[in-house]
Amino acid sequence: MPLHNLTRFPRLEFIGAPTPLEYLPRFSDYLGREIFIKRDDVTPMAMGGNKLRKLEFLAADALREGADTLITAGAIQSNHVRQTAAVAAKLGLHCVALLENPIGTTAENYLTNGNRLLLNLFNTQIEMCDALTDPNAQLEELATRVEAQGFRPYVIPVGGSNALGALGYVESALEIAQQCEGAVNISSVVVASGSAGTHAGLAVGLEHLMPESELIGVTVSRSVADQLPKVVNLQQAIAKELELTASAEILLWDDYFAPGYGVPNDEGMEAVKLLARLEGILLDPVYTGKAMAGLIDGISQKRFKDEGPILFIHTGGAPALFAYHPHV
């Protein structure tokens, strides 16, 4: 892949060194398959997570445009909103977050703990809405109101998932390929697929760098029919930005997110407990727990293309564990 195509985009350096790519010996023994994990849960800011890779590009663009305010949206327990607020604090910017309660709970822990608690620490301005039914339009309307108050807002989409933000996961694919080179031939890569930027960025990068590896997105909020166009559209938009072709098939599994986004399920919580007990690594109930449930079931159901090593992309999210107590 021509690296110069990535380097022409302004980017802030938040992460520094590559995040670890580790072998999981006890988990591998338990599953009877070599399992590796990419530790994007340990990126440096605000208790870690994958969105920081996207924010390196998005925040750089905001500064280039002269913005003094970052505006974004998500669930009350959004990891993306938490990381955006932290970046705003680090850069001396105002942050306005449009939040919804997707599970309709009145549980105090969900409404005040976990990521929501951290938003207060980052001095985030919170705006609540009934539902993010049309988040792009709702964010633009909020930006207009904020601008009328004298601020210079920059809108970051839900999950940081546009073509610019997703470049962070093309960059991640480069990192993964370099870490695997001469060390391990990964057969399959598993990632949670939600707002689709992480999945689409990896799809573009891995197609060119590790073409023999299949990439599987485990959906956390939508059926394959609803999620596929989101990932494909972003995949093509990223490729256009980089002047590359992107023809890799997008593979999605939608068997593991029921009963819905943000609602824990038994398989996901078992996966959270299993990795904690075997490896001391924390997953979360919303994204990585469900994605790991897909990996575990995928092995038992022989859904992977072969029996080679599997890489799990750990996108973070552990702060939500505290909000979902006592489900945990």
From Swiss-Prot:
Highest taxon of the lineage: Bacteria
Stretch forming the signal peptide: none
Keyword Lyase: yes
Keywords, ordered alphabetically: Lyase, Pyridoxal phosphate
Cofactors: pyridoxal 5'-phosphate
One of the record's GO molecular function terms: D-cysteine desulfhydrase activity
Statement: the UniProt record of this protein carries the keyword Chaperone: no
SUPFAM superfamilies given in the database record: Tryptophan synthase beta subunit-like PLP-dependent enzymes
E.C. numbers: 4.4.1.15
A Gene Ontology biological process term: D-amino acid metabolic process
Reaction(s) this enzyme catalyzes, per UniProt: D-cysteine + H2O = hydrogen sulfide + pyruvate + NH4(+) + H(+)
Top EC group: lyase
PTM sites of type N6-(pyridoxal phosphate)lysine: 51
Role of this protein: Catalyzes the alpha,beta-elimination reaction of D-cysteine and of several D-cysteine derivatives. It could be a defense mechanism against D-cysteine.
Record-stated family: Belongs to the ACC deaminase/D-cysteine desulfhydrase family.
Subunit structure comment from the entry: Homodimer.
Name under which the protein is recorded: D-cysteine desulfhydrase
Gene from which the chain derives: dcyD
